Amino acid sequence: MVRDLSFSGNRAIDDATLRMSMATSRSSAFARWPLVRGLGFLGEKKYLNETQFRRDVLRILALYRRSGYREATVDTIVRRTDRDVYIRFIIEEGEPVRVTSFQLTGLGDIVDERRLASNLPLRVGDPFNLLLLQSSADNVRALLRNRGYPFPEIFEGYDVRLEQHTADVSFTVSPGPRVTVDSILVTGTETIEESVVRKAISVHAGDVFDESRLFRSELNLYRLNLFNFASVGIADSLEREQGDTTVTVHVRVSEASLHRLRLGGGYGTIDCFRVLSGWTLYNFLGAGRTLDISARFSKLGVGEPTDWGFQNNVCPALSDEDSVRLRLNYNVSVSLQEPFFLSTRTSAAVTFGAEQYTEFAAYLRQSIGGSFAVTWRTPFEVPITGSYSLGRAKTEADPATFCEFLDVCRIEDTDVFTEPRFRATFGLNFVWDRANSVLNPTRGHRLTAEFRHASDFLGSDSLIQFTRGLVEFASYYRVARRAVFAWRLRFGAVVAPRLNLESGAERFIPAEDRMYGGGPNSVRGYGQNELGPLVRVLERGTYDSTTGRVDDAAVVRTSASGGDQVIFANAELRFPLPVFAGRLVGAVFVDAGQVAQRGEEAVTLSGIRVTPGVGFRVATALGPIRLDIGYNGYAPRSSRLYKPEEGELVLLAEDYTPDTSGLLGKFRLHFSVGQAF
């Protein structure tokens, strides 16, 4: 068994690239570790093949030759034991052949030849890498095809002088004729109108040929969800003569099913059991429109009207949830989407729906209404969405939150904040997504920004006026062949005007628009909404002001009151584990964050809470199923403690801190689907 495989002397080519060029590889970590290798079934064992091993030396030499190191030599050291083989490749790279001149001719006035040559992958002073030479030629071809020259020819030349370790490189370019699009040919449509295809593509008759527009057109066709296959290219022609200045663009499509039924189910730490269903009709009333009807239900089995007592067994995270919020969550909606609204780059959607949603330990929201959204896809493929929503909504939160922030402590007086009211908001969303996957990204980055504003000018009730902003940036890097390092920064704030209430002029922010923290997708050392301002109510029992403790039989209700400022930072290393055929992925992470309230506290370094943890992910067709365990070494957050007496909340303690639990209580378990970010 190959126990170890290493390299020495390699500087120009890293270990990972060398390993990928070879047939010989070392056994997995579990198969090599002394403590577990004896189990036999853990890890993948790799054995030495003498023939492939000798060929690996030639493969490494060939890689160095192509990379410009013509004098490279490779030696090996093989140490054998009764069970294992230890291999070491000793590489002497030698002096590389370097490019001393790069001449680019034939482009004329199309592009500045000297400037282009200085920006190609292979440049003067670099080792003479044949792979980069080919990549440079491909770059020149792509540039010409995007500027109206679809049939360029490039004659590559180079003169290598091994004794001097120098190479002169030249590209002689024949661009061919500059071409315009004569006509568009569409084939493959059956029930979908040809006009839908023509609206989606980015190339039109009379345009100067641009290959990038052909690729963009294919992407636009797939985004419609109307086609299983789409191809946009130059039509085949046996009669094309040299010097022709026009081409026909051929669009080939194959229609997909125009009906789609979705059914799903799952389990989450906070949602308990959840189900969803949806029916989508594509090309509804023609013109590529989409009609979508969907319904989602969660917290099945833990609240009215499906109270099966699951909070006492399979969903223990909900065991302490207030009965007011322990209800079935639902969202039922009907949406009509117009793919081309005013322009081919703009789409629109009208949605009507009803919702009941409970945010754990925070609030219950019921709403019915509609929204109108317009999305503009910029020339840089960055969608910007503006939306207006109007509905009738009711939000119920713990009366103690109104007592704490608004000094409204009579319980009947807090009813004014929970009455149904009109809610009208304007939203703006920005997404710059360059990650390679939505569910499980391994490289790239993603920037999102969200802005939402509510005011009486838009039709909102006088109590529902605020401005809220949130920005998030995440980045993903491969640090090994299958390991990924990911990090994220998220921050936001919400402000509201002063309103004249009975308690005085106060800034009221609705509970559903406040900032919360803690949980599987933010700071995992805390439970859902545990990070940030809290408020506690003594429902039963007594409080001793001398000791600052409640009696053993006391029942204290904890609610998250939220804040108006938030910042999160996360770092996570994801790496494959050598079990279950590589479908199990491990993770180590560190989360940091703070939720603050102006006037009470500010976002500071000392206030930021840092929690480490470990996790596991199992790859499935629907995305990774995730189990995370976060460790919280901090004492419980202190808060005000109230007690209801004769219809009023009486303050018992300004800074009440519950008793700390044992070591086990410092860990938080989170189970969900998809990566944390």
Locate predicted features:
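Repeated loop/turn-to-beta-strand initiation elements of outer-membrane beta-barrel proteins
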Residues: 228, 259-261, 272, 284-291, ...
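Transmembrane beta-barrel wall of Gram-negative outer-membrane proteins
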Residues: 321-420
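Conserved helix-loop functional segments at active or binding sites
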Residues: 122, 203, 223, 281, ...
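Short hinge/gating elements
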Residues: 42, 123-124, 296-298, 317-319, ...
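Periplasmic polypeptide-binding modules associated with outer-membrane biogenesis and secretion
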Residues: 1-273, 278, 292-310, 315-330, ...
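One face of beta-strands
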Residues: 9, 74-76, 154-156, 230, ...
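C-terminal outer-membrane beta-barrel translocator/porin domains of Gram-negative envelope proteins
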Residues: 259-262, 266-273, 280, 298-301, ...
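A short, conserved beta-to-alpha structural element at the edge of catalytic cores
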Residues: 609-634
